[in-house]
Amino acid sequence: MGRRLAEEVISVVECRPELRKISFVAHSLGGLIARYAIALLYESATQSDSHEECEKHDVDYYSKQHTLEGKIAGLEPINFITFATPHLGTRSHKQIPLFHGSNKLEKMAYRLSWIAGRSGKHLFLKDTEDEKPPLLLQMVTDYGDLHFISALRSFKRRAVYSNVCSDFIVGWMTSSIRRQHELPKQQSFINDGRYPHIVYVEKPKAQDVDFSDAMIYQAKTTSEMEEVMLKGLNRLPWERVDVSFKKSRQRIFAHSTIQVKTYFLNSDGADVIFHMIDHFLY
C-alpha cells in the first residue's frame, strides 16, 4: 500500500529539480495509500539544515518553524487533503452505511473481507501477522522505520472532506476522524451560497490527547482499536469539512460526487472542489 505512489513521486521530483513544495489530494482508499506513501517519503530535518534552507529561500518565521518538521521527498509539505477516506477502517459498527447498521451484514462482510485482498484485510483490521498490530493502527504513530505521524505532522494543513449522508461506502465518522457524539448536529449546519453542499466546517484545533505507542499493541476489540486510531490521529489538528448531497439528484453517487469523478454524474460536487481550491495553501 503506497509504495508505487511513493516511487512515482520520487520519479517526478527527480525529473523536476525546480520543485520546492508538495501537496497530496486523495479520494477514498487513496487517502490511506497517500498516508503510507508520505511515511516512505518522509525525511526528518535538523534545525541547522532547516535554518540554512530557510535563509536560502528567504521565508518568514512561521515557515522556518514549519520546515523543522521535516520534508516529503525533499520538498516542503503544504496540504494533505482527503475526500471520503476511511481513516478508521470499515470494521466498526455503521462505518459502511450500505449495511444500514445491520450487525449480521457487517459480520458477514468482516468474514468475507479476504475476497478484497490485502486492502480488504487492512480496512477490516484483520491483517494481524507476525504479532504486529493491524496496519491502520501502525499508521497512527511512527512505527519502525516508517514515520507515519511525523509525516502527517510535517504538512502545514491537514483537511478531511466527509459525506454527512448518502455515501453508502464510507461512513461519516471514519472519514471525518470523529466519535459518534462529536459529529455536528443538523441545527449547527450552515447555509453558504458559495458552497451549497458544504454544511459544516470545523477549524483545526489542538487536542490534549492521552496516547502512547503501547496502545496499538494493547487494543484487541473493534471499539478499542477505533479509539486508539482516533487518539493517535487527533494528536494533530485537522480541518473538517462536512458535505451533504441530501437535496441533490446525484446523492446516490455521493461517494463519487464529492470529488466530481465524472462530470455528467457528479457535477453537483463542483462547489466542494471550488472550496478546496479556494482554501488551498501555496
Question: What is each PLM-predicted segment?
Answer:
Residues 2-133, 144, 156, 167:
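Serine-dependent carboxylesterase/thioesterase catalytic core
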Residues 54-62, 68, 100-282:
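Extended, polar/charged low-complexity intrinsically disordered and coiled-coil segments in eukaryotic
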